[in-house]
A protein has these predicted regions:
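Transmembrane-helix motifs of polytopic, lipid-linked glycan transferases
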Residues: 8, 75-96, 134, 138
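Transmembrane-helix signature of polytopic, membrane-embedded enzymes
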Residues: 88-112, 129-130, 147-148
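Membrane-interface transmembrane helices that cradle and orient dolichyl/undecaprenyl
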Residues: 94-96, 133-156, 257-271, 316
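Short acidic/glycine- and proline-prone juxtamembrane loop motifs at membrane-interface regions
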Residues: 117-128, 243, 297
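Membrane-interface alpha helices of multi-pass inner-membrane proteins
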Residues: 151-169, 175-180, 208, 283-292
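Hydrophobic/aromatic-rich transmembrane helices and adjacent perimembrane loops
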Residues: 173, 293-328
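Perimembrane helix-loop-helix junctions
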Residues: 174-207, 265-266, 310, 317-318
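Short periplasmic/luminal acceptor-recognition loop of GT-C membrane glycosyltransferases, typified by
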Residues: 180, 356-410, 416, 427-449, ...
């Protein structure tokens, strides 16, 4: 019943966003990568993006099972968010928290994982935390017993953790911290032999979780491509910035202080703080990974919300749970909070009245226009609204523009691209491939403020292309006849 309640709430909040062309560029990219996998082409071999393969595997699975449907892809997101929130509930119940408290915190985790910014789609953070919370719940249960005899559980938890890292690689940091802590705890309490059994079973689980994603590449004799994309390219992408460090280090310091305090207090099976160190270490590892990456995007925080609301259980607000006034205010808060969803319900209703369909956005309208006008569909460059490729059953012209922003990431080119610079890539696309149609944002072109690249793009467009039409924020350009 708890899962069903969470599922209904998640569905209600997220449903109006099922019909948007794209919610975040990353999700559109994942759909393209997943479609290629569903068509029989492994990630990184025909299209490329900087994420581990399991993220694309989700989209490929949904497309394979349900066909090309934004509805089903995002319905799967409802299940993932609901299940992750339910695992927050299960973790808290396993640590002797009341049903009411556990449900409230799970509900808040669900809300924050579905609202505020471009998180109503299915992000890699959603997928990774689904597996990570699975591992944390299993390890948390086994840790309460503090015995190596539950080696199957240690291995299963490790397997979930391995899968989580293959959805979002930064989770390797919290996994390593938790594993090191548990091993040290076992070493001090149970001796070397039992610690080795624990470490072997949990470590083997993690390695199996990682290794299963390499199997398809070994079969295709493409292990090197997997290795470069999963492990080498992310190292090149991460750039340490002091601004990010100064922002997050104070929070890490507070969490470390709480961790030290928690370790000073003896725990038992009936305590609600038995797994407190695991959650704190997970949060510290998560924030540490952001510091190492040098940036914090809004959707990165999706990985923190389940952990933060678990930590909130130890704030001690039990007395408010018996107050009808407090519960009433909380209900009102929950009703008012999803204002983005209410706004989107209005938008899809209006779109239905005007266009006869709930599906909306430039990524839907541009393909419809191109088909209606019988424009060439085999050679299109979407520099915005690139979900349009998927709607048209096409693929991006080169691997570097699978995600349009990857065009500017020269430091990643050595891991997948024959061309070494963005200028070379742009010249290849415009001079050799000569897209028949190019789509950009008419006000905020991705080349804006890019110096040499902006000049190069603007010059080529003025020489070879003419404006076709404006659809929403999308400006379509058509190649001039003499330029073909």
């Amino acid at each position: 019943l708890v899962f069903l309640a969470l599922f209904i709430v998640a569905f209600t909040i997220r449903f109006p966003f099922f019909f948007r062309d794209y919610i975040d560029k990353d999700e559109s990219t994942f759909i393209l990568m997943g479609q290629a996998w569903a068509d029989g082409y492994l990630p990184y071999l025909t299209l490329w993006d900087l994420k581990p393969p399991l993220t694309f595997g989700y989209f490929g699975l949904m497309i394979t099972v349900f066909g090309k449907s934004l509805w089903w892809i995002r319905m799967g997101g409802v299940f993932i968010v609901s299940a992750t929130s339910f695992m927050v509930y299960a973790f808290l119940r396993n640590n002797n928290n009341s049903e009411k408290k556990a449900f409230i915190l799970a509900l808040l985790s669900l809300y924050f994982s579905s609202l505020f910014g471009s998180v109503q789609g299915v992000m890699s953070e959603h997928i990774s935390m689904f597996f990570y919370m699975g591992g944390l719940v299993v390890w948390g249960y086994a840790y309460k017993e503090l015995t190596h005899k539950k080696w199957v559980l240690w291995g299963l938890g490790g397997f979930f953790f391995g899968l989580s890292a293959m959805s979002k690689l930064n989770l390797a940091y919290p996994i390593l911290l938790c594993a090191a802590y548990i091993s040290l705890k076992f070493l001090l309490a149970k001796g070397i032999k039992n610690t080795l059994i624990l470490s072997f079973s949990s470590g083997l689980g993690v390695l199996i979780g990682i290794g299963v994603t390499a199997v398809p590449y070994l079969r295709e004799n493409a292990f090197q491509e997997w290795w470069k994309a999963v492990f080498l390219a992310p190292r090149a992408y991460a750039v340490f910035h002091w601004n990010t460090a100064f922002l997050l280090l104070p929070i890490v310091g507070v969490l470390t202080f709480l961790l030290v305090k928690s370790l000073q207090k003896p725990q038992n099976k009936k305590s609600d703080k038995t797994n407190y160190p695991l959650v704190l270490l997970s949060t510290i590892g998560m924030l540490g990974s952001f510091i190492m990456a040098g940036k914090v995007n809004g959707h990165y925080l999706l990985q923190c919300y389940p952990l933060i609301f678990i930590l909130c259980a130890w704030l001690g607000f039990e007395r408010y749970l018996s107050s009808k006034k407090a519960i009433g205010l909380f209900v009102i808060f929950c009703v008012l909070l999803p204002f983005e969803s209410y706004k989107e319900y209005g938008a899809i209703y209006k779109n239905k009245q005007v266009h006869g369909t709930y599906y909306n956005g430039e990524g839907i309208e541009i393909p419809a226009y191109l088909k209606k006008k019988q424009r060439p569909l085999d050679n299109i460059l979407f520099l915005e609204y690139h979900i349009g490729y998927w709607i048209l059953d096409k693929r991006p012209p080169t691997m570097a523009v699978t995600h349009p922003s990857n065009l500017f990431r020269n430091h990643l080119f050595p891991y997948y691209n024959k061309r070494k610079t963005a200028q070379e890539e742009l010249s290849y696309i415009l001079d050799s491939l000569k897209p028949a149609v190019i789509v950009i944002d008419h006000k905020n072109s991705i080349f804006k403020g890019r110096g040499v690249l902006e000049t190069q793009f603007t010059k080529k467009m003025s020489q070879r292309y003419t404006k076709d039409t404006l659809i929403g924020k999308a400006q379509l350009y058509q190649i001039l006849p003499f330029s073909k």
